[in-house]
Amino acid sequence: CYFMYSFANTGKILEAYTEYRFLPQLTARIGQFKTMYTIENPMSPCFVELINCYSQAVNYLAGINGSDPLYGSNSGRDMGILIYGDLFKKKLSYNLAVMNGQGINLKDKNNQKDIVGSLMVHPLDWLSVGGSFVKGKGCAVAASSVNPDIAIGDSYTRNRWSAGATIQTKPVSLRTEYLAGKDGHVKSDGYLSLIHISEPTRH
């Protein structure tokens, strides 16, 4: 079992879930946890390179900081059930989930579920390539000036997808992604690329 609570502002539960490993290649998780959309969103803030943590595109499309008013501020998390694992001697990693699509600490307001999936291929020890998607129906928690046709409480199409790659070597690491979404009839997209250079350790 895992539990994470934030004491900031009024305080709230961020994560609460339990897991069971059926096979070395298959683990199931149920509860409230990070949505497996994009490479960046599931990452801990401790490992994200940016000063303000997550990138602008991921903040918006993954529903992290409230920059998408329709979805609200949900720290990139949701409630649901997830299966995940590694296949083919860890050359392929997969995640597949059924989520409420309403964010954290809220019951499903439209009885519609989101299907979330991601797939990463690791052809080389230092290279990973893959993508992810969210297909579902949102229920607007606030009005948005960029999407005025959707009112508070309306159900709307909320789809997302992404494609990206990571390169990990001792001196240099690279993470790059293209992500896009559609809320109702309004489309949005973004691109990010980060390079991290490590200085060799001197003894």
Question: What is the predicted function of each stretch?
Answer:
Residues 39-42, 53, 94, 105-107, ...:
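Outer-membrane beta-barrel proteins
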Residues 16, 42-45, 108-111, 143-146, ...:
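Surface-exposed beta-strand edges and their flanking turn/coil or helix-capping segments
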Residues 122-194, 198, 202:
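Detector for outer-membrane/organellar transmembrane beta-barrel domains
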Residues 1-101, 111-116, 120-131, 194, ...:
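Outer membrane beta-barrel
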Residues 2-4, 104, 148-150:
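Short secondary-structure boundary micro-motifs
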